[in-house]
């Protein structure tokens, strides 16, 4: 009987092997592809009819991509298909792993169609609808109970959970993705703070005047067209240095530089070692794991519970997990740190009709969906400035992704990086606000613009090996002469289209800008010519293609200075708090670059501390 069963199983497995796989050359294939970053090396073992094994050999991915590296190889082997769903929150890494297996199958002569069948989808326990206010009764008993419940595991959520538990409250952090970090982990690792424990040293190195809190506040409010809430801006500005020093004390490594992105008129932007947000979120997670806080991944909030009695208080949440639904009590409060809604076309397009579905976003699509706002609105929360949505001007024009190379044009203007259009002419004040730069790029006449520089210009924030890696990856274009660079730019397709840059225009543009550095004035666009700017005097020359991509939503839930969420009548909703991109009012119409990290980290820490203690931290001045 056992022998008959064994034969039956063998036949079943044979029948399960994809049809038309015969003729595939068995062997082990090593493929090098791009995930979120270059250098993803995958070893694929094939028989003459099946995918036998998939092994990640080397990679440069950051923590948001780790779940894809761990889970996807086994999923592909089990399904015998490269059409398996990617891992939520790790799309770029997932695509890289699948591309490597596809390359191996192609090299082996396989019929790709046979290995591209879509597996049956599992039932999604988390519904797409959002409950109407009052549609669910508050539980009489709870599956779990904590003092503080934090929803979301990015900058704000990790900071909030840490300050709450360190202030003496039992704390749980729930995150809908399979890892913490979210969009915070893939940002550019740029952190604005008017001072820090290393500020004086860096200011002395670059001969810079000390910055002030008042100037940071002024720049932020002006950069948002005076639509910010001044008290919230003040909290961010004073909280940011405190939290940066906390990170530095716990081992955060930053580059030996200070930058001045567009809209800032002080050198106050610190750059993390790898110019990626996971430098911060990985450290935040390490800090949190050294406390008694509980972290629950793949746990999606689907309802906020608010009582209907006189207290009318938020007392907990309902979540969906792979094992079903459960309820979590929050004895002191729920902190929403769920991020923005840039990936939710149905949510963003009614606010800004031009942000159509075909426009890419820099963010993880599964992360920036806005349900934290929807669910808070369902219990009466108010929103503000929802139509203030920012595009990142320097994303990869072919993908919309904010990769590490898209950070250099953002950091570079204060050191001499210039932006040119498809003819090789400057089209904007490179030191201006993001919205100004994005609008100028869209109106430049082509679907890409270019950041132009030489190695000395970017030496303060780009290592030589990083520059060479960018060239090897194809994202950074290099020419020993301007003639060669023009040829490289014109040969680089942007969504099937090609520019018409001329070396003569590039030369004239560079010579004119060099003269502006010497004279200290830019009569063309009024850029502030800084002493840190370096002239482009000899090759090799470099260019990075860049174009706007939907990035940050400045609007969100209305909060007060305690981070308490307010309702549609202007009253505080007891027990409900929020921090980070889920809130509105900090940035006004436009967020200055590097203020996002400051906003989320500062308000996350403030929120956790206040919910736990009922007081604001000592570093916050009287408001």
What are these regions (language model features)?
Residues 123-139, 170, 179-294, 419, ...:
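Conserved N-terminal/central alpha/beta ligand/cofactor-binding core
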